[in-house]
Amino acid sequence: MLLIPAIDLKDGRCVRLRQGDLDEATVFSEDPAAMATHWLDLGARRLHLVDLNGAVAGKPKNDAPIKAILDAVGDDIPVQIGGGIRDLDTIESYLDAGISYVIIGTAAVKNPGFLQDACGAFPGHIIVGLDARDGKIATDGWSKLTRHDVLDLAKKFEDYGCEAIIYTDISRDGMLSGVNVDATVRLAQHVRIPVYASGGIAGLSDIEALCAVEEEGVEGAILGRSIYEGALDFQAAQARADELTQ
C-alpha cells in the first residue's frame, strides 16, 4: 500500500483546500521544495503535486515551485502532477522536466480523445483523476457536476491505456471525515488497473480499512490535510500499511 503525500500549490505556496474551494485555502508552507524534502526524509516513496492555479486557468501556473521540488527530490522518488493539463505539449514538458506521472482530470472527461492520444504518446505515464460526488463525475476544479457515471468512465479510460486512477470523493476531501472505502472498492473492482484513494482520509483506521481491500485493486492513497494537521503520522501510517500488506 503506497501512501503518497500531497503538495497542493497555490500562488507558489503549499496549501490545503476544503472541498476544493480555492477561497478556503490553509497555507502550510511558503517553501514547497522544503516540504517535499520533509516528506522524502519521512520515507515517502512518491509525491503527489497539484497545481491549483493551473486547474482553474487550464495551463501550468506554478512552474517555479514545481521545478524547485523536482530539483530537491526528483532524483530520489517519482513525482506525479495534476492541475491544468490540457494538451500534449504540457505533458511532454513535464515529463522532460523529470515528472514521472501526469494526472489528467477535467480534460479526460471533456475531451476523451485527448486522453486517448496522451496514453498513446506517453504510455505508462498517464494517470486519470476521477473526482466524484454520489457516483457522478465533477470537473473544472469540482465546480461543475456532470451526469457521467464514475464506473462507466473508468472502464472507458482503462481501455485507452491509462496507468492508474486516482479516485477522489469530493464531498469528503479536506474534511477529515473518513475515506469512502465502499465507493473506492466498487471502482477498483470494476477495472484491472490500480486505484488510489483520495479525499477524507482522517486517521490510521482509514489506512487500515484501505489495506484490507488492497487485493481488490486499491493500491494506494493520497494523503493531504490529515498529515499536515497531525491527525495522521505519515511514518507510522506507512509502517502500518507495510505491516498489513506485505
UniProtKB/Swiss-Prot annotation:
It is an enzyme of class 5 (isomerase). SUPFAM superfamilies: Ribulose-phoshate binding barrel (SSF51366). Pathway: Amino-acid biosynthesis; L-histidine biosynthesis; L-histidine from 5-phospho-alpha-D-ribose 1-diphosphate: step 4/9. GO terms for cellular component: cytoplasm. Its EC number is 5.3.1.16. It comes from the Bacteria. It is found in: Cytoplasm. This is 1-(5-phosphoribosyl)-5-[(5-phosphoribosylamino)methylideneamino] imidazole-4-carboxamide isomerase.
